[in-house]
Every structure is written in C-alpha cells, then in structure tokens.
C-alpha cells in the first residue's frame, strides 16, 4: 500500500476519521491472507499519515508519548496492504503482511489469553521467540 503524500492530505480521509478527544483512533492489525487478528494499537494523525505514505504500520505509543514504527527495534514489521474504516469512522482496520511476531511477548498475536465461561484465563499460544531475542538483553516494555 504505497501512497503519495497527496493521499495523506486528502480532506475526505481526515473528515471521515473520528479521532478521540486525545487525538487518537484505535487500530486493529489483521493478517491479510489468514484473517488472524494480530494486535490493537492507536494512531494519531501523524502516525496515520506516515502509514499511508510509507505503506508500513506506524502507531502512536501512549506509554512513550511518541511514534512507534512497528518493527523499528525488533525487525517484526507490518507491510500495510489495505486500510479500512469502520462504519462510524472511529476504528481503523489494517490488513497487513506481518513479518515474524506481532506481540512484544514474542507471540504471533497479542490475543493469546482465552477467557473461559467462568472467567478463568488460559494462555492458548506460546511465545515463538523471547522478548530478549527481539529487543536485546534489556528486554522491552509494552509500546
């Protein structure tokens, strides 16, 4: 999904996206060919613009207060093949080609905790790689 900066400046897009009072919009990343839901993150206008221009997922890290270019420290990138808005314009769906794992815990998906009928939580997927292997000896805090 490589786009020109002209697309990022499209008035229709900015009118359609409903950012929160904090200037953010929730984003779901989904593997384009399998339908697997990989993660949920946030974008601000700058992150959305960068994603559109580069074709690579860029999010807003609320904990760090800065842009988070997916894979910049781990190499686990997301190539954006399509971007969709929901019917209200308040959630974005990215159809991506995920390189490696999406979760900072080393799992393919961030959705690895399954909640049972009585509220018990079962971990349904093991890490494919350690956070230390992804981010170095210091590990990684949640984006």
Curated annotation (Swiss-Prot):
Q: Which residues cross the membrane?
A: none
Q: What is the uppermost EC class here?
A: hydrolase
Catalysis performed (reactions)? 1-(5-phospho-beta-D-ribosyl)-5'-AMP + H2O = 1-(5-phospho-beta-D-ribosyl)-5-[(5-phospho-beta-D-ribosylamino)methylideneamino]imidazole-4-carboxamide
Keyword Magnesium in the entry? The reply is yes
Disulphide bond pairs: none
Q: What is its EC number?
A: 3.5.4.19
The alphabetized list of GO BP terms reads: L-histidine biosynthetic process
Q: Keywords of this protein's UniProt record, alphabetized? A: Amino-acid biosynthesis, Cytoplasm, Histidine biosynthesis, Hydrolase, Magnesium, Metal-binding, Zinc
Q: Where Mg(2+) is bound, by residue?
A: 86, 88, 90
Just give the chief location class: cytoplasm
Molecular function in Gene Ontology: magnesium ion binding; phosphoribosyl-AMP cyclohydrolase activity; zinc ion binding
Q: In which pathway does it act?
A: Amino-acid biosynthesis; L-histidine biosynthesis; L-histidine from 5-phospho-alpha-D-ribose 1-diphosphate: step 3/9
Regarding protein family, the annotation reads: Belongs to the PRA-CH family.
Subunit and interaction comment = Homodimer.
Q: Which PANTHER family match?
A: HISTIDINE BIOSYNTHESIS BIFUNCTIONAL PROTEIN (PTHR42945), HISTIDINE BIOSYNTHESIS BIFUNCTIONAL PROTEIN HIS7 (PTHR42945:SF1)
Q: What is this protein called?
A: Phosphoribosyl-AMP cyclohydrolase
């Amino acid at each position: 999904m490589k786009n020109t900066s002209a697309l990022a400046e499209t008035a229709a897009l900015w009118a359609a996206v409903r950012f929160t009072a904090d200037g953010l919009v929730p984003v779901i990343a989904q593997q384009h060919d399998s339908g697997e839901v990989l993660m949920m993150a946030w974008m601000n206008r700058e992150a959305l613009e960068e994603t559109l221009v580069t074709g690579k997922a860029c999010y807003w890290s609320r904990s760090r207060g800065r842009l988070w270019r997916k894979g910049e420290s781990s190499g686990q990138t997301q190539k954006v093949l399509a971007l969709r808005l929901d019917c209200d314009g308040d959630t974005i769906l990215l159809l991506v080609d995920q390189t490696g794992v999406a979760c900072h815990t080393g799992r393919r998906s961030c959705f690895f905790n399954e909640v049972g009928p009585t509220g018990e939580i079962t971990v349904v997927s093991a890490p494919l790689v350690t956070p230390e292997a992804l981010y170095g000896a210091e590990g990684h805090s949640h984006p």
